[in-house]
């Protein structure tokens, strides 16, 4: 067993956070409460880890308490049971009944959003969504009040999807796990949720995400890919520079509790009474909540068909259905109850008699002893869930069948279908003919086959208990954290903006190298193609200020063609490199080619035809052609379809136009690029650097380099080029670089050779504004604020404007070195 002792040699604390505490609280008098622990799968699941962890529960106590004195009294009583209450006064109804049960629950169970008046639905949704976020914040506040360094937090279910994000924002060192106890739907269903992206991002903040089945995990990964555009791997999801592990943990029950209960004298007596009541008949059992997803109407329709087609069994079988009431206050549930009662009346009327009824329907819950007794005497367990998380009723039935070895007929849409599929008869509950046939097969099954099937299921239920589930999850969470930290160490840190500004202000010869697409280009909407790239209008004055500073040289290095760069930078005092350096241009001079004399471009027309073919057959894809390269881009196409098309496209290319060509083929995140061999941004910048030193007749070495862009992996040699040039003293190559004055920053990429990362191009824009102000303060002819900073709207980049204004006010702090007092 894994040793979980923390650095202090003590058991680490585990905070188990769920919507509801596992305690029933009843007021027994003024400021006094009676508490009773509620048994269940989650409680059982944590029994095995209480010896490893000091476990405390956090959740709603199940009662509304408004008086502070009563709150304190209940809190003190709950503390004795290691429970910490979250009082959700004022938000519970909108949070729980509204958003959780009215929005998330139907979506997760493939039922879709409520179909009501659109105007009312929008208003209601916003109110419920706000209450949901507020409730998650209230959980956070309670956790913060009780958090101790080193605590592990395990969040449960869809009620708390924002909590992992809130916890990491509070302290990103907290170990956070999140487990979903319901299904996760296909991406086509999930994407109808208005808050779809926000919820996905929030739970991806956790270190470990757990699901009941591989299907649920697969749907989640596919949804992350389609909605967030991230890659799902066998490890999980890499998002915003961190790894979130996604794994499968099928929950179980406490089988020993059921086995022990079946042997109690009072339960044995109940079993005898039930067998006497149903003497001479086979008993088919159903135990479900009266809920739309449980498929009770489908169960009755299949049973009706069975009785129609098998007259022999009409007086020899009885279906006992325990339908536990749930939400009688909801119209849909009242309608379901009426429908179920109608079916019971119809079937009993058709096939019943004065002395015998084929269906015994109970609209109530039963005590645990009676439940075990009826599980034990049943011949067949019939589970027809239309969509379910795990459905532990099937596990409970198996645990109680040690003597009788009855048959389990199980819906393929219940999570247990993937665990108990070997021993159960798996059915599609929507196919009443298939379910009817399965009932007949179960009733007629030979004893030897029943024994074999039961043995398989019984072994699984006993070895995959709730206790094992809890241990497995915590073992994975504790094992994945060091791995996550190791991954984080491989992932560069955020760019230290203040260090960049400080080094820039102290330097005398600065070099700034920037990409165009995804860096300086105007942010694109879904209808824009890369052929239409335009310089971000906020940067026009900024680049002008930087380029006119005699101490600063700016280079734009792009895969785009000469015409695009001319159109955007033609009038700037800037160095340009088109098609990854195949062509370069000094400020207002002429383009110079670096293309080898013997380069063969006969492949271009053939590749262009293949790209055109796939563009026509991949909606929202496009391709860009330049003199030495072509790029097919499917960034705005359906992600999975685009990837499949890209695989086919590559096969077409290798089989045809590039089979014998000297080209490089680069597979990007959402693109395929074919270009003349041998040219990369790293090779280009070495040549451009030599030209800069020569043409500017530099006498002072370059003592500051900032290099940033949204580059393909093969072009990241531009970062390693400068790493190799970092020297302890001035060198003849025109560089005087040290670790402290070289800054490379990849934009929005978790895996990179750059030293640092920037979340988005907005961060680069913001930094360039600030560097332009520093450059402006050291020049005689200063630009106006509006020339340097040209926001597209009045509210854009308020932080940048405040910083710029503060520097304007502090010009007196700038000395001869140009250093700004920070």
Swiss-Prot record:
Keyword match Protein biosynthesis: no
InterPro entries hit by this protein: Glyco_trans_20 (IPR001830), HAD-like_sf (IPR036412), HAD_sf (IPR023214), Trehalose_OtsA (IPR012766), Trehalose_PPase (IPR003337)
Reaction(s) catalysed by this chain's protein: D-glucose 6-phosphate + UDP-alpha-D-glucose = alpha,alpha-trehalose 6-phosphate + UDP + H(+)
BP GO terms, sorted: trehalose biosynthetic process
EC number: 2.4.1.15
Family statement drawn from the similarity comment of this UniProt entry: In the N-terminal section; belongs to the glycosyltransferase 20 family. In the C-terminal section; belongs to the trehalose phosphatase family.
PANTHER family: ALPHA,ALPHA-TREHALOSE-PHOSPHATE SYNTHASE [UDP-FORMING] 2-RELATED, TREHALOSE-6-PHOSPHATE SYNTHASE
Protein name: Probable alpha,alpha-trehalose-phosphate synthase [UDP-forming] 2
């Amino acid at each position: 067993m894994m040793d979980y002792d923390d650095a202090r040699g003590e058991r680490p604390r585990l905070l188990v956070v769920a919507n509801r505490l596992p305690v029933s609280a009843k007021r027994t008098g003024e400021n006094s409460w009676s508490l009773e622990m509620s048994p269940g799968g989650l409680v059982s699941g944590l029994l095995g880890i209480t010896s490893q962890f000091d476990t405390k529960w956090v959740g709603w106590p199940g009662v509304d308490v408004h008086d502070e004195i009563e709150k304190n009294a209940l809190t003190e009583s709950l503390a004795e049971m290691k429970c910490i209450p979250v009082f959700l006064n004022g938000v519970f109804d909108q949070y729980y009944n509204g958003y959780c049960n009215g929005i998330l629950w139907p979506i997760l169970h493939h039922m879709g959003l409520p179909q009501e008046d659109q105007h009312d639905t929008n208003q209601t949704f916003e109110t419920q969504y706000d209450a949901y976020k507020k409730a998650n914040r209230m959980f956070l506040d309670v956790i913060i009040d009780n958090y101790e360094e080193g605590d592990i937090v395990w969040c449960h279910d869809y009620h708390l999807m924002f909590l992992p994000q809130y916890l990491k924002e509070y302290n990103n060192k907290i170990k956070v796990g999140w487990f979903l106890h319901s299904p996760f739907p296909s991406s086509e269903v999930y994407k109808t949720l208005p808050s779809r992206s926000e919820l996905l991002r929030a739970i991806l903040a956790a270190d470990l995400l757990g699901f009941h089945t591989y299907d649920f995990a697969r749907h989640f990964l596919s949804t992350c890919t389609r909605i967030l555009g991230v890659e799902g791997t066998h490890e999980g999801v890499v998002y915003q520079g961190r790894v979130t592990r996604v794994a499968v943990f099928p929950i179980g029950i406490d089988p020993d509790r059921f086995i022990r209960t079946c042997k109690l004298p009072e339960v044995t007596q109940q079993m005898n009474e039930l067998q006497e009541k149903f003497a001479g008949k086979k008993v088919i059992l159903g135990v479900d909540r009266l809920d739309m997803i449980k498929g009770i109407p489908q169960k009755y329709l299949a049973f009706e068909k069975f009785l129609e087609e098998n007259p022999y069994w009409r007086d020899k079988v009885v279906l006992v259905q325990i339908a536990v009431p749930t939400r009688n206050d909801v119209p849909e549930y009242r309608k379901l109850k009426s429908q179920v009662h109608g079916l019971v009346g119809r079937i009993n009327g058709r096939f019943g008699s004065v002395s015998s009824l084929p269906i015994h329907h109970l609209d109530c819950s039963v005590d645990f002893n009676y439940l075990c007794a009826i599980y034990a005497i049943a011949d067949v367990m019939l589970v027809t869930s239309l969509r379910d998380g795990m459905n532990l009723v099937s596990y409970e039935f198996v645990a109680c069948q040690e003597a009788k070895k009855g048959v389990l007929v199980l819906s393929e849409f219940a999570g247990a279908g993937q665990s108990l599929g070997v021993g159960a008869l798996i059915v599609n509950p929507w196919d009443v003919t298939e379910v009817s046939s399965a009932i007949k097969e179960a009733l007629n099954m030979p004893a030897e086959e029943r024994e074999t099937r039961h043995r398989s299921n019984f072994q699984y239920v006993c070895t995959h208990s709730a206790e094992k589930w809890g241990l497995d999850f915590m073992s994975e969470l504790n094992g994945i954290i060091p791995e996550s930290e190791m991954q984080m160490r491989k992932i560069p840190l955020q760019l230290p903006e203040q260090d960049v500004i400080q080094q820039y202000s102290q330097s005398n010869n600065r070099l700034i190298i920037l990409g165009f697409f995804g860096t300086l280009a105007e942010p694109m909407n879904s209808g824009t193609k890369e052929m239409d790239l335009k310089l971000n209008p906020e940067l026009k004055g900024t680049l002008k200020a930087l380029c006119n500073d005699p101490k600063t040289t700016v280079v734009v290095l792009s895969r785009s063609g000469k015409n695009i760069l001319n159109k955007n930078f033609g009038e700037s005092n800037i160095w340009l490199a088109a098609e990854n350096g195949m062509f370069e241009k000094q400020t207002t001079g002429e383009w110079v080619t670096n293309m080898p004399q013997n380069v063969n471009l006969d492949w271009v027309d053939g590749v262009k035809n293949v790209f055109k073919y796939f563009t026509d057959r991949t909606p929202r894809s496009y391709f860009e052609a330049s003199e030495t390269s072509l790029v097919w881009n499917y960034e705005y196409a359906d992600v999975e379809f685009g990837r499949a098309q890209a695989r086919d496209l590559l096969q077409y290319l290798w089989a045809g136009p590039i089979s014998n060509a000297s080209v490089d083929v680069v597979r990007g995140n959402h693109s395929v690029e074919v270009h003349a061999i041998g040219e990369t941004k790293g090779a280009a910048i070495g040549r451009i650097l030599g030209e800069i030193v020569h043409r500017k007749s530099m006498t002072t070495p370059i003592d500051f380099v900032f290099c940033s862009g949204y580059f393909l992996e093969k072009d990241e040699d531009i970062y390693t080029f400068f790493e190799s040039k970092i020297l302890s003293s001035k060198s003849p190559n025109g560089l005087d670089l040290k670790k402290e004055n070289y800054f490379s920053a990849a934009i929005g990429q978790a895996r990179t050779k750059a030293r640092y990362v920037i979340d988005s191009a907005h961060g680069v824009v913001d930094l360039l504004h600030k560097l332009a102000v520093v450059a402006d303060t050291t020049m005689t002819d200063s630009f106006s604020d509006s020339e340097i900073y040209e926001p597209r709207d009045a509210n854009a980049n308020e932080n940048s404007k405040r910083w710029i204004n503060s520097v304007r006010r502090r010009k007196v702090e700038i000395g001869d070195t140009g250093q700004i007092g920070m």
